Amino acid sequence: MAIHLYKTSTPSTRNRTVDSRVKSNPRNNLIYGQHRCGKGRNARGIITAGHRGGGHKRLYRKIDFRRNEKDIYGRIVTIEYDPNRNAYICLIHYGDGEKRYILHPRGAIIGDTIVSGTEVPIKMGNALPLTDMPLGTAIHNIEITRGRGGQLARAAGAVAKLIAKEGKSATLKLPSGEVRLISKNCSATVGQVGNVGVNQKSLGRAGSKRWLGKRPVVRGVVMNPVDHPHGGGEGRAPIGRKKPTTPWGYPALGRRSRKRNKYSDNLILRRRSK
């Protein structure tokens, strides 16, 4: 992708970068509106994700995570921006007339052909079961349950690695560093998710961040005691506690939030790296 750097004509455009080749012109039959109750709250109105709210209205793009157009070749027609994820998406025209969106594999260009099935080439963008892949294959959009669609390694730049196959299971190393078992019958897509340099892009101004629905992050130590346990004091005072805490008084910075005795505990061979 071509990254365009704006000239320093105004403070808002100084060092701002955009991808000049990616457009946003979705097909009407592959989008639908969605009710945004957002702001990082759950059904009870409790904050579950901080610093969320506002942002531009979005139309949801229907992404084909299942890749169930078996043994039918498709051609990449467009590479588009998706406001609902940090990865780009591709519009695929299949030979039978079907049109679908998929995640954009890194290196794929307009005009490339892809296919999904059981005996397809090990080529970037092709989808096939893990049992038909050689060891060491880089993959993304990985199913956890067969037929449910890809659920792992879907973010921009994400890639997992097939490191072993034994019995009915395959061993994968996920982007987080976690090593876990998955059924060999589950499907995955060959290659890495595109838009690898998403973290190196510069938005240029605070307003661009607000368009994405991300609100400012305020440190607890500069708040009042009524707002945060770290708040209060004269000047730059210490937090007054042995360990940092959340605004609700729970331990912060590394507290484990995974449920105990989860069904998939016996499938995880090595926990993710911190």
Curated annotation (Swiss-Prot):
The keyword Plastid applies. InterPro entries: NA-bd_OB-fold, Rib_uL2_dom2, Ribosomal_uL2, Ribosomal_uL2_bac/org-type, Ribosomal_uL2_C, Ribosomal_uL2_CS, Ribosomal_uL2_dom3, Ribosomal_uL2_RNA-bd_dom. Keywords: Chloroplast, Plastid, Ribonucleoprotein, Ribosomal protein. It is found in: Plastid, Chloroplast. GO terms for cellular component: chloroplast; mitochondrial large ribosomal subunit. Pfam families: Ribosomal_L2 (PF00181), Ribosomal_L2_C (PF03947). The keyword Ribonucleoprotein applies. Belongs to the universal ribosomal protein uL2 family. This is Large ribosomal subunit protein uL2cz/uL2cy. The gene is rpl2-A.
